[in-house]
Amino acid sequence: IMGFLMLCMLSIMLPRAAVAADRVEEVLASRTVIHDPKEAKTFAGEKKGQLVFDHVSFKYPGADENVIEDITFTAKPGETTAIIGSTGSGKSTLVNLIPRFYDVSAGSITLDGVDIREVTQHELREKLGYVPQKGLLFSGDIKSNILFGNPDGSDAELEEAAQIAQATEFIEAKPEGYASHIAQGGTNVSGGQKQRLSIARAIAKHPEVFIFDDSFSALDFKTDVTLRKALKKRTKDSTVIIVAQRISTIMGAEQIIVLDDGKMAGI
């Protein structure tokens, strides 16, 4: 009987495995479209973080029309630049150009005077703390997730990042605290907890440029206000870019950019 049951299980698993194998093969066969320059430049040693968009336009590969059209602005250290607009206006696409998930179709983006296409992706991303809308967590524990971008970080840095991100309360409520297990993708924590841990990870990295892509959307109003107040003190010397839907999230921004159908409707 057991042999028959095993045979039935195999007959179910094999087709699923074949489909999964096709998907894995498709990923492995994909060509990288973003490349490092053959003779890469480097950033100056001084910590700055000034980000300049100069007449930036972008369209997805194979598309006929630009989704971002002629965007020009400067985000300065010590200031918060907020980007708002309706759904589909190009907010996330715009900030995804900064870590070079895509390259601009026209114009340029410079960081501290260097075109981001002229440095390696590793060096560029070392300067960035990026928090996507959907908090991304890895299998491991809370500590390893927060210190992912700063593996040599101290316990003091770990706890400070969690405190600023308003994650301390729910972490300390767990029996194992910072050693608590995190499932792949963070499926064993809530959406708000996932976002707070992702924010804590960016804080613990000590980047020059913070990018929050609607990263406060799953937080309640009180937590949102408290977190942003603590974050303002922590990022006083950094460049902060926030994509948001809620007006309350961007009230303290020094610069607000309004996008409409991929174009700047106001600043």
Language-model segment annotations:
Residues 2, 30-33, 176:
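Flexible, glycine-biased helix-capping/connector loops in cytosolic signal-transduction modules
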Residues 2-27:
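Cytosolic ends of transmembrane helices, especially the final helix of ABC transmembrane type-1 domains
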Residues 6-9, 40, 161:
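Long alpha-helical scaffolds
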Residues 16-19, 33, 202:
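Residue-level recognition of oxygen-bearing side chains
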Residues 26, 33, 147:
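Conserved E/DxxT/N motif and adjacent residues on the DHp alpha2 helix
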Residues 33-46:
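Pre-NBD coupling/linker segments of ABC/ABC-like ATPases
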Residues 44-267:
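ABC-type nucleotide-binding domain
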